[in-house]
From Swiss-Prot:
Keywords: Chaperone, Cytoplasm, Protein transport, Translocation, Transport. The gene is secB. One of the proteins required for the normal export of preproteins out of the cell cytoplasm. It is a molecular chaperone that binds to a subset of precursor proteins, maintaining them in a translocation-competent state. It also specifically binds to its receptor SecA. InterPro entries: SecB, SecB-like_sf. This is Protein-export protein SecB. It comes from Methylobacillus flagellatus (strain ATCC 51484 / DSM 6875 / VKM B-1610 / KT). GO terms for cellular component: cytoplasm. It comes from the Bacteria. It is found in: Cytoplasm. Belongs to the SecB family.
C-alpha cells in the first residue's frame, strides 16, 4: 500500500523553484561625471528577452535579460543590463505544458527580481530609479509561437 502511494506521488506533476539568482549584471555610465549636470530629460528604452536550458532531467534554467538604455540626444546617460536567472524543477508534466511553464510561468516569477535589481543599481549609480512596468509574458509567448508558425509555414512551401 505504501509503495503504491509512493509510486502515485512520483507520477504527480511537480513544479518547484530551486534558486533565483543574478547571472550577469553590468552598468555603464560612459559620460560621467559630465552627464550628471545635464538638465534635459533622458529618453529611456527597454529591451527584454528570455532563454531556457535543460540542465538535467526535470531541471531547467530560465534567464530573463533586461537591458535599459537612457540617452540624452545622442549621448548615453547609462546602460544597465541584468540577466536574472532561475533554476526550476518540472517533473511529470506533458512537454507542451513544460514549454508554457518555461515561457510564461518562470519568467513571471523571475521578472520582479530583475526589476528590483535594475531599480537598485540605477539608484546606486546616482540616478532616479527606473520603474519597469509588469510584462505580459503570456502575450509575448503567444506572439513568439505565431512568429515561429509563420516562419515554419514560409519555409515549407
Amino acid at each position: 500500500m505504501a509503495e503504491e502511494q509512493a509510486a502515485a506521488q512520483e507520477q504527480q506533476p511537480a513544479f518547484g523553484i530551486e534558486k533565483v539568482y543574478v547571472k550577469d549584471l553590468s552598468l555603464e555610465i560612459p559620460h560621467a561625471p559630465q552627464i550628471f549636470i545635464q538638465r534635459e530629460a533622458p529618453q529611456v528604452s527597454i529591451e527584454l528577452s528570455n532563454a531556457t536550458a535543460q540542465l538535467e532531467e526535470g531541471i531547467y534554467e530560465v534567464v530573463v535579460t533586461v537591458t535599459v538604455t537612457s540617452k540624452i540626444a545622442d549621448k548615453t546617460v547609462f546602460l544597465v543590463e541584468v540577466a536574472q536567472a532561475g533554476i526550476f524543477q518540472i517533473r511529470n508534466v506533458p512537454q507542451e505544458n513544460i514549454d508554457i511553464i518555461l515561457g510564461v510561468t518562470c519568467p513571471n516569477i523571475i521578472f520582479p527580481y530583475a526589476r528590483e535589481t535594475i531599480s537598485d543599481v540605477v539608484t546606486r549609480a546616482g540616478f532616479p530609479p527606473v520603474l519597469l512596468n509588469p510584462v505580459n509574458f503570456e502575450a509575448l509567448y503567444a506572439q513568439q509561437k505565431q512568429e515561429q508558425a509563420k516562419a515554419n509555414g514560409a519555409t515549407t512551401h
